[in-house]
């Protein structure tokens, strides 16, 4: 997670600087005052958030704002987090033409999740979003097609 040391004239100033520089809400940070001397405060600021939960919260809020009934399930393995969205009748709308809407949703979710990691010291997480098992079914169909074409070429 991101962390940084700040020296400023007040804790309020440190909070404002940290929010601006780290790009994270104040509620997602932990402030540890190291020293207070000569009208200066030295503070160690650490990001204290669960990025995987933030991604799920974003997707749930997105569904709610779009008036789409559905739920989001998350699966985590190694450094990959997969969000599986299940809806009754909005899969096509969320996937979009040529999967563009799904890809955009995955990209935005990845930005939200990885904003909590320091790119200089951490790799962050690989974020995948799937809607109604679309990506899994698509991968299976592509594998079958590749196998069929390979057999035709071999003849």
Please state what every model-predicted region is.
Residues 1-155:
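RNA-contacting regions in translation and RNA-metabolism proteins
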């Amino acid at each position: 997670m991101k962390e940084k040391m700040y020296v400023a004239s007040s804790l309020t100033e440190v909070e404002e600087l940290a929010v601006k520089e780290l790009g994270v809400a104040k509620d997602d940070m932990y402030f540890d005052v190291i020293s207070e001397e000569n009208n200066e405060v030295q503070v160690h600021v650490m990001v204290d958030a669960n990025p995987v939960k933030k991604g799920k919260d974003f997707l749930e809020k997105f569904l709610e704002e779009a008036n789409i009934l559905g739920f989001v399930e998350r699966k985590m393995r190694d450094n990959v987090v997969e969000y599986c969205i299940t809806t009754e009748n909005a899969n096509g709308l969320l996937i979009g033409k040529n999967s563009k809407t799904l890809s955009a949703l995955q990209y935005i979710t990845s930005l939200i999740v990885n904003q909590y990691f320091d790119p200089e010291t951490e790799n962050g997480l690989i974020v995948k979003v799937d809607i109604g098992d679309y990506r899994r079914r698509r991968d299976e169909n592509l594998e079958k097609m590749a196998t069929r074409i390979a057999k035709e070429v071999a003849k």
